[in-house]
Amino acid sequence: MLPEQVRVLVVDDEPAICRALSIALTRAGYDVLTALSGDGALSLLAQEHVDVMVIDLRIPDTRGDVVFELAAAIHPHLRHQTLFMTGDISERAHKLILSCKCPSVRKPFELKELIAAVAGLVPHRGRGRDARGQSA
């Protein structure tokens, strides 16, 4: 990882989503780690520094908001540098996202929307390349 490169952890129980986001974010200039479960994410976070976490709100083993709270206890900056993804439009999901005070993208989303949201979470550092591959 280059010193100026931002490291992003993508957490989703769907391997295809993790793979697609990993490819898109890597092409945008980010260093990407992936986890297919909440437990996997917490295990990675215990060993690795990440700058931004992108997490699905609904993960079978541990809800995304619970992982968020535990992750923020390990890396306090993640309290302000986490992006939620969700296809859940319930009032409960909406309240959870609001209570965490983190941005979210609704599934299905455009990759450029997610990349822009990630870039917005790291204004103080180099952002790699934008969705078109241009320098930020």
PLM ranges: what are they?
Residues 56:
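Active-site residues of response regulator receiver
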